[in-house]
From Swiss-Prot:
GO CC annotation: cytosolic [4Fe-4S] assembly targeting complex; nucleus
Pfam families linked to this entry: WD40 (PF00400)
Protein's UniProt name: Probable cytosolic iron-sulfur protein assembly protein 1
Provenance organism: Kluyveromyces lactis (strain ATCC 8585 / CBS 2359 / DSM 70799 / NBRC 1267 / NRRL Y-1140 / WM37) (Yeast)
Alphabetized UniProt keyword annotations: Cytoplasm, Nucleus, Repeat, WD repeat
């Protein structure tokens, strides 16, 4: 029977921890209501650096590493995005230079809820309470950003954005109970599909890490996790997506975060504090394991699989309202 083992509980923040991300060098970044961004070595669990908390006036809601780099984006409730970077030597014992603030991106009119890099690191997507998604083109150094598209078809607060790992597709999740799929159409980003079915805010979504299927999982205020599948892509402006399945009911309250692992597992967590692992079988999706009180009596805001290190060791990271980041080992057997 699969199970979860807590490897380390890191008391990193004085208030809610909202977001975590780990780069390919094993450096974890965290963002919090206390406005601080902390960098932690996932191997030693040691804090490497605390970034200047004067960069943001309010909550740091989302952090995301640019792929294959030492450049970090952080989105804040002060409606700005900060970009941080370190030289090519990266985070090692010999490099004692501080991470620099490279840029501040402005444009949104309200709280930023999520930031996400495209798989090639050329584009940064941001979403906000102002109901919009912005797409920015970044230079190689992470110092210059040009807005190339503003997407305004959601009718409410946009909670989350995520890019497909290889295709030019972006998914956005919203308080309007929908997920929208966007694609690059002749250098102009267009909404090619609206995924309807959830009966509450869609807090998070994630694409399957597969080269054969284009599928998306989503988690909602209605307590469900759903799977969506691309059925038809005419190559132009519209795509046909279907709701493939609703995963077995395992949450009693809102699902805040979902994440699809390279091995095919889906992890979800949320307001009830549960960490749930799902597995696809020949007969459909099953609940592989449930861990109660992931952060004690506090809500769990985010879950993320870690692709760093040995392929034989599967790690999960959760962030909670207690200000802690918990590192878990997932045992498939």
């Amino acid at each position: 029977m699969a199970g979860l083992k807590l490897l380390k509980s890191l008391a990193l923040h004085d208030d809610k921890c909202w977001s975590v991300d780990v780069n390919n060098g094993g450096i974890m970044a965290t963002g919090s209501t206390d406005r601080k961004i902390k960098l932690v070595d996932i191997r030693s669990f040691q804090i490497i650096e605390e970034l200047d908390d004067t960069a943001h006036k309010k909550t740091v809601r989302s952090v995301a590493w640019r792929p294959h780099s030492n450049i970090l984006a952080a989105g804040s409730f002060d409606s700005t995005v900060s970009i941080w970077g370190k030289d090519d030597d990266g985070y090692n014992d010999e490099n004692d230079l501080e991470t620099e603030l490279l840029a501040i991106i402005e444009g949104h009119e309200n709280e930023i809820k999520c930031v996400a890099w495209s798989h090639d690191g050329e584009l940064l997507a941001t979403c906000s309470r102002d109901k919009s998604v912005w797409i920015w083109e970044a230079d190689e150094m992470g110092e210059e950003f040009e807005c190339i598209s503003v997407l305004q078809e959601h009718s409410q607060d946009v909670k989350h954005v995520i890019w497909h790992q290889s295709l030019p597709l972006l998914a956005s999740s919203s308080y309007d109970d929908t997920v929208r799929i966007w694609k690059d159409c002749d250098d102009d980003w267009e909404c090619c599909a609206v995924l309807n079915g959830h009966e509450g805010t869609v807090w998070s979504s994630d694409f399957e890490k597969s080269n054969s299927n284009v599928r998306l999982c989503s988690g909602s205020d209605d307590g469900t996790v759903r799977i969506w599948c691309l059925e038809d892509d005419n190559g132009e402006y519209e795509q046909e997506w279907i709701q493939e399945s609703i995963l077995p009911k395992a949450h009693t309250r809102a699902v805040y975060s979902v994440n699809w692992s390279p091995k095919g597992y889906i992890a979800s967590t949320g307001s009830d504090g549960r960490l749930v692992i799902y597995k696809e079988s020949e007969d459909g999706w099953i609940v592989e394991c449930i861990h109660e009180l992931t952060h004690g009596v506090y809500e769990t805001n985010m879950v993320k699989w870690v692709e760093y290190g040995s392929k034989d060791v599967i790690l999960l990271i959760t962030a909670g309202d207690d200000g802690h980041v918990n590192v878990w080992k997932f045992d498939e057997n």
